[in-house]
């Protein structure tokens, strides 16, 4: 969504074309990794952008991501609290997980927290997760779930061959004709409308490559609510 390392084309650079007759360009109020699909919110005015940015900062929004991962995390419902610190080599940057107790001891490390739930699984070979980024660190969901040994399908940065993988058949794409694209999708966003003050819920359909995987595994988007964590707590 934003310009970054070696990233030339990004949404922020296209906002002039999204004015649609308005005086102001729309403003990004949060971001998605360049390979992540799903709900992305832009504000039409400066005042609305300020209001929405504050809502994200104060955690007054609710974000649910869907992912297909190798293997099946245990337990089926849990919270990951590894800290994250940027690790750089000559080729690329990635986030490294550190023990929560070591965060204050490591320069640049930040606390991070992710809730996850296994919605369904393909034996022990792969599973469909819902994830909530309680904090909003760079690559948080990808790094956290990979640290458990269950990298997201198509994640070339955190799911390489050196990554522990408990999913039998990962190298064979779990027995299906699956896309190499990242299987991480911002499915659901809930927040207060900045003008009407009423609850606003936004849902994004799966992108084609993930829809194909869901069809291959006989998973259906209709089988679970947009916020399955709320269903569990009721």
Segments predicted by a language model, with ranges:
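RNA pseudouridine synthases
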Residues: 1-93, 101-113, 121-123, 183, ...
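Short beta-strand segments enriched for Tyr within beta-sheet-rich domains
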Residues: 52, 137-145
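Phosphate/ribose-recognition catalytic cores of enzymes acting on nucleotide-derived substrates
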Residues: 104-107, 145-201, 224, 233-234
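Long C-terminal interaction/binding lobes of large macromolecular proteins
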Residues: 116
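Active-site beta-strand termini and strand-to-loop segments that position acidic
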Residues: 121, 134, 191-194
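Short alpha-helix capping/helix-loop boundary micro-motifs
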Residues: 125-127
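Short histidine-centered loop motifs in beta-beta connectors
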Residues: 129-132
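Short solvent-exposed strand/turn elements
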Residues: 134-137, 206-208
């Amino acid at each position: 969504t934003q310009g970054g390392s070696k990233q030339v084309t990004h949404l922020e650079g296209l906002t002039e074309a999204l004015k649609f007759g308005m005086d102001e360009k729309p403003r990004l109020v949060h971001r998605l990794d360049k390979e992540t699909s799903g709900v992305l919110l832009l504000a039409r005015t400066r005042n609305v952008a300020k209001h929405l940015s504050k809502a994200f900062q104060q955690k007054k929004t609710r974000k649910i991501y869907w992912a297909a991962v190798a293997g099946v995390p245990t337990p089926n419902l849990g919270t990951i609290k590894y800290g994250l610190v940027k690790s750089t080599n000559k080729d690329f940057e990635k986030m490294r997980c550190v023990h929560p107790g070591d965060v204050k001891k490591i320069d640049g490390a930040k606390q991070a927290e992710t809730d996850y739930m296994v919605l369904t699984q393909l034996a022990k070979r792969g599973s469909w997760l819902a994830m909530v980024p309680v904090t909003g660190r760079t690559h948080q969901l990808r790094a956290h779930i990979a640290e458990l040994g269950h990298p997201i399908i198509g994640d070339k940065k955190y799911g390489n061959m050196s990554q522990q993988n408990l999913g039998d058949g990962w190298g064979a794409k779990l027995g299906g004709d699956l896309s190499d694209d990242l299987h991480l999708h911002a499915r659901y966003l809930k927040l207060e409308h900045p003008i009407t003050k009423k609850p606003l819920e936004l849902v994004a359909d799966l992108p084609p490559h993930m829809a194909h995987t869901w069809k291959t595994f006989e998973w259906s988007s209709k089988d679970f609510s947009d916020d399955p964590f709320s269903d569990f707590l009721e």
